[in-house]
């Protein structure tokens, strides 16, 4: 009997021991800290010679290339986060960087580490760039030659800083680990000792998101954190970019475009200039791209410039991409010219030399209907032309459409930095041949164009161009036709009307419509009343001046308004 009791007792004890061990193990499993370490390739989603990029305090989608112990970033990454000035010409195997004073060039493929500057050939000591398939990589150190940013390489990751400010720093008060997620079972990224510091990214109830000094982002228990301080970061200022020096006229610019279709048109200077009260710049349409090699045709004459100077006027010769094409019906694709460094340079050199030889004061670029795929090459052309004009003491201005999202590739923000003046063509809201009757330049359209442009640059660089014309629209069923009406012909036009125009508060223009045998006629007039309102908006935005398209279309009253505006 005693033996049976003893056996039962031992069995119960054994069961309790087993249960205790099981429960203890379960409790240990539940409450003990995992010692599993994270695989960094898996954590960062990298393999081979790729490394994650930690930009500021965030792992971004783009990755770095580590080659020969050196760090490279692909061109898109450089453009997006560091410096968008780098330009590539694959056909001519060139990597270019154009600042305010020069263009630095390097061989693109098979680069030996050298690059060319005005002061001579420089050597980075290893390839400036690598080309792998369709992807171009730039050496991080080469980018730093022209950019204020910082980077540090670590195992499977590169820390990049492009911005600096105040960060929160926490001291570790006892031994712990940074884990992938907030939980004791999460894998370990790094062990920390008492006295180490981490950047505090986000503080939560029990765990906080932190970044270690070697760019690992994870979580630490709050109870392991000690003193938290605000630390001011020190910005990188190693690179000092050459200044974009600009030429500015004394007072407002008052520019008149002089439409010239042949050299004989230069003889109309006195006729055109005599009407223009207060004008201080005349811009003859002399130059037009004439082939796909970088050549242009010219109607320029020294005698015209001399005469203009004696009349107290500056002369800015206009270079366009459409007049020769329209006159001769010769197809000229500006993409072919602007995407080629050698052709682009030929155009830049040619127009600047011609301008200097003619004694011009400036160059005005009027490239219209530039395709989006040409945009990056057009901007590079303007960069290179701005350097050449700066060296030659020429004013550089560029004509632009009113800015909208669909023409952002004209890059008014960049133009505002590199140019002397940015001219907004404050018209063509509804244009000839559009089949869409409406105002050529309503006040909202003009105001939005000015305000958007001013938001991207110094207001003193902005010039708003006014139309000295409007359009008479005829709608017959689904058919819409139109014809131009100039300011100087408007009075005679209205004398023929049996009805008089009424002021439209929405467009701030005098509006007239009537029924004719041809259909419904509509016209939003440009006259002294509408021009006065536009000039008031220009004054309110304190822009750099006014331009008019074109000389020969104006009236004494409108020119008197412009003279008063320019003198204010």
PLM segments and residue spans:
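Hydrophobic faces of well-ordered beta-strands that scaffold small-molecule active sites
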Residues: 254-258, 280-284, 315-319, 363-365, ...
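Primary recognition of N-terminal secretory signal peptides and signal-anchoring hydrophobic helices
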Residues: 2-205, 234-248
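Glycan-recognition patch characteristic of GH18 chitinases/ENGases
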Residues: 232-345
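SH3/SH3-like beta-barrel fold
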Residues: 195, 207-212, 220-221
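Substrate-binding surface in catalytic domains of secreted glycosidases
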Residues: 291-299, 349, 372-496
């Amino acid at each position: 009997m005693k033996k049976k009791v003893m056996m039962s007792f031992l069995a119960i004890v054994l069961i309790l021991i087993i249960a205790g061990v099981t429960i203890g193990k379960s409790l240990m499993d539940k409450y003990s800290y995992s010692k599993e370490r994270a695989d960094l390739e898996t954590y960062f989603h990298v393999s081979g010679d790729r490394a994650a990029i930690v930009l500021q305090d965030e792992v971004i989608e783009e990755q770095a290339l580590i080659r020969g112990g050196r760090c490279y970033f692909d061109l898109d990454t450089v453009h997006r986060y560091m410096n968008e000035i780098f330009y590539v010409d694959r056909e001519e195997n060139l990597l270019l960087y154009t600042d305010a004073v020069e263009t630095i060039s390097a061989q693109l493929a098979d680069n030996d580490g050298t690059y060319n500057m005005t002061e001579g050939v420089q050597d980075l000591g290893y390839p400036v760039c690598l080309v792998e398939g369709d992807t171009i990589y730039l050496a991080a150190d080469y980018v730093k030659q022209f950019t204020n940013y910082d980077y540090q390489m670590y195992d499977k990751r590169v820390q990049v800083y492009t911005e600096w400010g105040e960060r929160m720093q926490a001291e570790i008060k006892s031994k712990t680990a940074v884990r992938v997620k907030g939980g004791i079972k999460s894998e370990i990224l790094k062990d920390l000792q008492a006295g180490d510091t981490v950047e505090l990214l986000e503080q939560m109830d029990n765990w906080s998101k932190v970044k270690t000094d070697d760019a690992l982002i994870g979580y630490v228990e709050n109870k392991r954190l000690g003193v938290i301080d605000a630390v001011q970061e020190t910005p990188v200022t190693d690179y000092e970019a050459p200044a974009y020096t600009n030429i500015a006229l004394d007072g407002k610019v008052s520019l008149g475009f002089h439409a010239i279709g042949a050299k004989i048109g230069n003889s109309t200077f006195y006729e055109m200039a005599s009407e223009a009260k207060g004008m201080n710049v005349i811009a003859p349409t002399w130059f037009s791209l004439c082939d796909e090699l970088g050549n242009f045709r010219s109607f320029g004459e020294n005698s015209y410039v001399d005469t203009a100077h004696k009349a107290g006027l500056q002369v800015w010769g206009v270079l366009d991409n459409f007049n020769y094409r329209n006159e001769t019906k010769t197809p000229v694709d500006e993409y072919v010219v602007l995407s080629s460094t050698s052709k682009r340079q030929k155009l830049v050199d040619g127009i600047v030399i011609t301008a200097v030889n003619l004694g011009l004061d400036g160059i005005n670029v009027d490239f219209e209907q530039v395709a989006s795929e040409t945009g990056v090459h057009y901007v590079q052309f303007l960069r290179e032309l701005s350097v050449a004009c700066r060296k030659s003491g020429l004013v550089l201005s560029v004509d632009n459409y009113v800015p909208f999202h669909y023409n952002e590739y004209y890059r008014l923000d960049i133009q505002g930095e590199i140019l002397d003046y940015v001219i907004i063509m404050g018209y063509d809201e509804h244009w000839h041949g559009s089949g869409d009757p409406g105002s050529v330049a309503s006040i909202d359209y003009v105001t939005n164009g000015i305000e958007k442009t001013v938001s991207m640059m110094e207001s003193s660089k902005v010039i708003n161009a006014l139309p000295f014309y409007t359009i008479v629209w005829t709608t017959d069923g689904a058919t819409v036709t139109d014809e131009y009406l100039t300011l100087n012909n408007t009075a005679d036009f209205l004398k023929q009307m049996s009805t008089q125009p009424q002021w439209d508060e929405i467009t701030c223009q005098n509006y007239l419509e009537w029924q004719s045998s041809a259909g419904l006629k509509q016209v939003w007039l440009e006259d002294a009343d509408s021009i006065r309102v536009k000039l008031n908006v220009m004054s309110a935005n304190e822009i750099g001046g006014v331009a008019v398209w074109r000389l020969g279309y104006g009236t004494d009253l409108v020119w008197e308004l412009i003279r008063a505006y320019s003198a204010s």
